[in-house]
């Protein structure tokens, strides 16, 4: 007992000492204020950086249906291999290959595929192989081919044989279990015996994939606890031209019948060209809706408004922008999507959803029309969408766009038009320097509270280069800390800011076109960036209501390099305070909770690094991660030392 009393006295002395010498005196009004939307913190998916094919979509075969413009791109062939399209297995993907005898007993016919930057194979993992096959032109009674998985030294590590006896297309499957981990393997197929054989839709998935998605990447998303999931883009919604825009109806139904689409990111950046980057659409709208359910996020699909990318096309280009008189098919796509998501199984598109295995509706509540659109071309088209959507589905919220910039003439015009049209939310985008984020923590303090709410749909801090280097745009601690500081302003203004999503989401370490990105991966593993941990800490400590936190009667938004916000969680009956110290010195802070008598014990979660350029990487995943400790209040006052360069969450 005497020891406990001594420790208690020491603790009280320490708290009193901090209290007396505190540099900052924060006051929190504990009366719950504005409601924080469940959608406040979320994720945005776009197929950039090989985020879908070669990433979240777990298919390991590149160009599995031989539909790339170069039909054999991704494949190495040997012997007698030709591409055919006579009497195909799938009308919308008509090309397939024919393997015929090599013409000599010592020669072989076959082909091999290295997947996306090599095939990552895990020891003990089972891989599900499938292919559609038939005897070619009734040549022989049967044909046999061997399927192998091969390591970096060109040694087969597992194989299987498949015998084809029919001249009708049939699906053949086999499971391959590997006994070693391989970073860059390949799949090889040999024709072994008999006449010619036709093959199509050659596929390989890891057994632990979930609805065709990589298990580890799904887990990375689920553990963010996002409230909103925006998909499928982004610029791919628009397309470089209308022919390459994202068309959701091409992404539902059997994957074998989903037509190929060109990915606009395969040629956008001359220094990062990927001519083999296409969209097989195996990761389609049905899968996006399923993933939304899986991770507990509200879906937000975004559709083309009839304008191709305005960066890449002139406003008067009739080939790039649909005329108003021809807009109805685009509007029908939006109406049909809502029916696909929410309609009864007796409806046309509700039946498609049910036939895919989900008779229950997806409970879609909002839809985005257009991506980064600006100027007069956009609002007149958006208005046409809004009239018909609201007439048929008045409960669906509509998200418009303020364009690609955080301010300026086009931004102001966009907001003016969005208010005039009466959209529910306005999508703002800003990829800016850490200084911009630090200087804009009060961005939304003076926004008009009437009219549309804010959706910060794409944002990320792009780090300055060192010395004379260009912007390096890495996911380092400096960027993450500035985002954490800025997000105190999002939280404080939750009455007008309803949702926010960092962008982009995924990047393959060998296949990226854009950085920074929230989650990096190779073919075997992934890494959660420091920015990921900032997003996770906000999402898991979102709360239900804003609490007014002030110092000297004013919001804490960067004076003396400190930022803060506070929320209350009704379900957990918890008070949560977030403090960001971007200074090089520790800050001593008193936080007084007005209206409370005592807080008791709580926990402190700290994200800190002494090195602003510190990163989490595949070879060092936990370089910068949150650390948790206990804390105790003195009555209704919490006295803390906030470490230099840190983001701290206090929860009582």
List PLM regions with ranges.
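Bacterial Sec-dependent N-terminal signal peptides
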Residues: 1-25
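Extracellular and organelle-lumenal recognition/adhesion modules and their flexible linkers in secreted
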Residues: 23-280, 298-300, 313-328, 371, ...
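Conserved, mostly hydrophobic/aromatic
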Residues: 43, 131, 225, 292, ...
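An active-site-proximal structural segment forming one wall of the substrate-binding cleft
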Residues: 176-179, 185-186, 206-226, 281-291, ...
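Active-site groove signature of glycoside hydrolases
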Residues: 191-192, 232-235, 305, 310, ...
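Catalytic-core region of carbohydrate-active enzymes that cleave or remodel glycosidic bonds
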Residues: 387-388, 394-397, 415-418, 424-541, ...
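Short, well-ordered beta-strand segments enriched in hydrophobic/aromatic residues
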Residues: 574-581
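C-terminal beta-sandwich/jelly-roll accessory domains of carbohydrate-active enzymes
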Residues: 582-652
């Amino acid at each position: 007992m005497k020891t406990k009393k001594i420790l208690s006295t020491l603790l009280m002395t320490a708290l009193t000492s901090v209290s007396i010498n505190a540099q900052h005196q924060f006051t929190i009004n504990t009366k719950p204020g504005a409601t924080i939307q469940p959608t406040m913190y979320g994720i945005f998916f776009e197929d950039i950086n090989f985020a879908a094919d070669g990433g979240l979509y777990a298919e390991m075969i590149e160009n599995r249906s031989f539909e790339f413009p170069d039909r054999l791109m991704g494949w190495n062939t040997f012997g007698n291999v030709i591409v055919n399209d006579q009497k195909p297995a799938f009308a919308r993907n008509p090309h397939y290959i024919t393997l015929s005898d090599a013409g000599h007993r010592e020669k072989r016919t076959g082909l091999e595929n290295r997947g996306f930057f090599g095939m990552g194979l895990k020891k003990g993992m089972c891989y599900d192989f499938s292919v559609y096959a038939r005897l070619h032109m009734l040549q022989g009674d049967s044909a046999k081919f061997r399927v192998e998985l091969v390591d970096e030294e060109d040694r087969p590590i597992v194989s299987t044989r498949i015998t084809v006896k029919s001249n009708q297309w049939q699906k053949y499957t086999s499971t391959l279990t590997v006994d070693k981990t391989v970073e860059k393997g390949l799949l090889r197929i040999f024709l072994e015996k008999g006449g010619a054989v036709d093959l199509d839709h050659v596929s390989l998935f890891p057994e632990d994939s979930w609805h065709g998605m990589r298990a580890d990447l799904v887990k990375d998303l689920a553990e963010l606890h996002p409230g909103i999931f925006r998909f499928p883009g982004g610029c791919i919604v628009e397309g470089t031209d209308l022919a390459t825009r994202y068309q959701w109806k091409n992404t539902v139904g059997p994957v074998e019948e989903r037509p190929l689409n060109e990915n606009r990111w395969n040629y956008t950046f001359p220094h990062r060209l990927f001519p083999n980057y296409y969209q097989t659409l195996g990761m389609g709208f049905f899968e996006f809706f399923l993933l939304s359910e899986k991770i507990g996020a509200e879906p937000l699909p975004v559709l083309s408004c009839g304008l191709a990318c305005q960066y890449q096309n002139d406003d008067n280009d009739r080939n790039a922008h649909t005329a108003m008189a021809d807009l109805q098919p685009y509007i029908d796509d939006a109406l049909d999507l809502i029916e696909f998501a929410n309609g009864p199984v007796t409806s046309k598109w509700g039946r498609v959803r049910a036939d895919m295995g989900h008779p229950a509706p997806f409970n879609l509540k909002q839809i985005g029309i257009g991506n980064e659109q600006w100027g007069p071309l956009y609002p007149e088209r958006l208005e046409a969408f809004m009239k018909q959507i609201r007439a048929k589905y008045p409960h669906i919220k509509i998200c418009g766009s303020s364009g690609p910039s955080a301010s300026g003439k086009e931004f102001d015009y966009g907001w003016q038009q969005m208010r005039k049209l009466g959209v529910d939310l306005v999508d703002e985008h800003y990829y800016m320097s850490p200084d911009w984020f630090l200087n804009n923590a009060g961005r939304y303090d003076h926004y008009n509270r009437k009219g549309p709410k804010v959706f910060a749909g794409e944002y990320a801090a792009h780090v300055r280069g060192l010395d004379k280097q260009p912007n390096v745009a890495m996911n380092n601690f400096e960027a993450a800390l500035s985002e954490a500081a800025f997000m105190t302003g999002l939280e404080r203004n939750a009455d007008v800011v309803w949702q926010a999503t960092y962008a982009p989401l995924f990047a393959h370490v060998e296949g990226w076109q854009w950085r920074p990105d929230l989650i990096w991966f190779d073919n075997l593993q992934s890494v959660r960036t420091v920015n990921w941990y900032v997003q996770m800490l906000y999402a898991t400590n979102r709360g239900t209501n804003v609490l007014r936190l002030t110092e000297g009667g004013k919001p804490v938004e960067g004076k003396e390099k400190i930022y803060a916000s506070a929320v209350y969680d009704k379900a957990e009956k918890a008070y949560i305070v977030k403090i960001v110290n971007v200074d090089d010195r520790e800050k001593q802070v008193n936080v007084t909770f007005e209206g409370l008598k005592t807080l008791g014990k709580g926990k402190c979660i700290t994200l800190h690094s002494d090195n602003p350029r510190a990163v989490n990487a595949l070879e060092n995943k936990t370089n910068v991660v949150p650390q948790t400790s206990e804390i105790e209040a003195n009555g209704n006052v919490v006295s803390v030392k906030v470490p230099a360069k840190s983001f701290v969450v206090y929860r009582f």
